[in-house]
Amino acid sequence: MDVNPTLLFLKVPVQNAISTTFPYTGDPPYSHGTGTGYTMDTVNRTHQYSEKGKWTTNTETGAPQLNPIDGPLPEDNEPSGYAQTDCVLEAMAFLEESHPGIFENSCLETMEIVQQTRVDKLTQGRQTYDWTLNRNQPAATALANTIEIFRSNGLTANESGRLIDFLKDVMESMDKEEMEITTHFQRKRRVRDNMTKKMVTQRTIGKKKQRLNKKSYLIRALTLNTMTKDAERGKLKRRAIATPGMQIRGFVYFVETLARSICEKLEQSGLPVGGNEKKAKLANVVRKMMTNSQDTELSFTITGDNTKWNENQNPRMFLAMITYITRNQPEWFRNVLSIAPIMFSNKMARLGKGYMFESKSMKLRTQIPAEMLANIDLKYFNELTKKKIDKIRPLLIDGTASLSPGMMMGMFNMLSTVLGVSILNLGQKRCTKTTYWWDGLQSSDDFALIVNAPNHEGIQAGVDRFYRTCKLVGINMSKKKSYINRTGTFEFTSFFYRYGFVANFSMELPSFGVSGINESADMSIGVTVIKNNMINNDLGPATAQMALQLFIKDYRYTYRCHRGDTQIQTRRSFELKKLWEQTRSKAGLLVSDGGPNLYNIRNLHIPEVCLKWELMDEDYQGRLCNPLNPFVSHKEIESVNNAVVMPAHGPAKSMEYDAVATTHSWIPKRNRSILNTSQRGILEDEQMYQKCCNLFEKFFPSSSYRRPVGISSMVEAMVSRARIDARIDFESGRIKKEEFAEIMKICSTIEELRRQK
């Protein structure tokens, strides 16, 4: 029987059909090669938008800088970055007037956080530009390197462990005439292999001391490294994103803390909340506009898009905002917060790896590093690249480009949201003093604008007024990419609104399936994704049940763990059949051991091991959950783990899932090839760092774990803790006298060794 597909939708309200419009199957595009071209595009575009500004030269670094602030008022619709200081301050003042005490309270909250934040806050985050090695590193390693070099240069305020004290060191480091750093380098030499008698290249890693003068150090401290943004769908061209170094990160963190605190108090802000909470907050604004548009009034909504948001924002404007927001606060606080925008006004963009050339005829490949672009002959490049390099040359110093205007992606999301909301806030009737008025939603560069007016002319006038007001603060609404609709239907941050936010379940499709971490985590993540979608995305019970069955099937094929009584032959089936036959209670076997699936949509919240524990044979329990099982590189797992899931649109989301440590929670071994490269030294540092932290947490289990306060070192803290624990255990009879004596002896030996060192 043929089914007419339109029949499927007869009973479905049209907004529910959105999941059928899903365009993103298959893998998203990833970038290969260097990001140098994309970074040059960003730098050149940013300068083009501000070209009528004033040029100055930075006295410390010699970098040419363009300042578009208070530049000419725009005469056309081209995007421009000429924000007017007095307009921004006016918008800030009005924001405060309509939300009494908002800045004051946020400053107090932030001040408290500033005084309590530990320097290890900076270990969060992924790749960070490491100024000591002049390339990207994991955040923890980059921080450790920075602190190590600060200390060897006599900057020791950071030893208190407070972030604010580390930032004092950063400030002092910028005044020093020179900084001595340790860098890694590698030597290659050809040697004969004893076994095979062939010639092989042997690499050795060395560390060498290097002195940076004030200018070179400042350039590195102000550098943002650039990479290409990966996995971006729906774009023909890739684009560059920035990773700042450790000197900038701490200051940015405090500014964003203040801005976040303000955003939380603004009903039009889509940050910092997410998910259902965000939907509820936004639905409120829409409801307000719809109830206030009386029968006589029209209400329209613009699904907005801004042209090159980051490249038209300006750090100098952010400095003005912060100066205003903190105007009644203590001097030290104002200084700390004003440093981030000042550093961004003087930032340098590192151009990345440079260009790769290959000659097909001679089979030669050579890399032109970014440092050489300043004076290489341009005849080797194509026309497009020639233009780029020509344009950027006046800005180059040591392979980095001076980039004073613009913000680079993802740096001040919260603060730029405050600026956006302050313009939405100017739409109140008492401010427009006309028949039209507006309100809306803002989340970083994304916005939705709701305009109410008695007639269509009024709506048009309101939109025009909003457009021009935005221009005055460097926000450029794109007339081509924004569209207007009767209020009740619009899109904002990939949420589609039609008489309420519509669940777009298809967006979550890419996160269904087997993640490929290990058997234990994958099972847990798989069922958690289904559970979360039932809660948040209108995934109905029948569909969920089907998703679950498909997931189990997928899982069994991935790990070749078909049921023990199946006919399917795989590499594992022989062992699994044997296990099946000798198991009394077959229902107790995990799916990954060839057992049956006991999940249904009612028990998705229970980890599989717990679900089947009572059904397991005793010896199976003993093998499965035995930390002493020698065949398992066993990893201790907190009761909750975090997985990264990829929705179709927007950033990768972190998702919590329950983790029960079993013999299936293995971790794959690291690739050996890294051990022969220049990364090896770093890898060893990282492992050392990891081991120390793990050891420390052994002594301070999370329940009693308070960060060590004061100046006692990690070792001293652990020794004193060991002594206290030993005494308690001895007095309660948990350990014998000999064991107690031995522990005390070890503690004394450690202290003795420290004194000698």
Curated annotation (Swiss-Prot):
Which keywords fit this entry according to its UniProt record?
Eukaryotic host gene expression shutoff by virus, Eukaryotic host transcription shutoff by virus, Host cytoplasm, Host gene expression shutoff by virus, Host nucleus, Host-virus interaction, Inhibition of host RNA polymerase II by virus, Nucleotide-binding, Nucleotidyltransferase, Phosphoprotein, RNA-directed RNA polymerase, Transferase, Viral RNA replication, Viral transcription
Query: What is an annotated GO biological process for this record, any one?
Result: symbiont-mediated suppression of host mRNA transcription via inhibition of RNA polymerase II activity
Which residue positions does the secretion signal occupy? none
Reaction equation(s) it catalyzes? RNA(n) + a ribonucleoside 5'-triphosphate = RNA(n+1) + diphosphate
EC number from the UniProt entry: 2.7.7.48
Q: Which GO terms describe its molecular function?
A: nucleotide binding; RNA binding; RNA-directed RNA polymerase activity
* Cellular component, GO annotation: host cell cytoplasm; host cell nucleus
| Post-translational modifications | Phosphorylated by host PRKCA.
Q: Where is region (Disordered) located?
A: 52-82
Where in or outside the cell it occurs: the entry states:
Host nucleus; Host cytoplasm
Show the segment(s) annotated as Promoter-binding site.
249-256
Cystine bridges: which residues?
Answer: none
Composition bias (Polar residues) maps to 55-64
Q: Which InterPro entries match?
A: RNA-dir_pol_NSvirus (IPR007099), RNA_pol_PB1_influenza (IPR001407)
Give start-end ranges for motif Nuclear localization signal: 187-195, 203-216
Q: Which family does it belong to?
A: Belongs to the influenza viruses polymerase PB1 family.
HAMAP family in the record = INFV_RDRP
Q: Tell me what this protein is called.
A: RNA-directed RNA polymerase catalytic subunit
- Coding gene? PB1
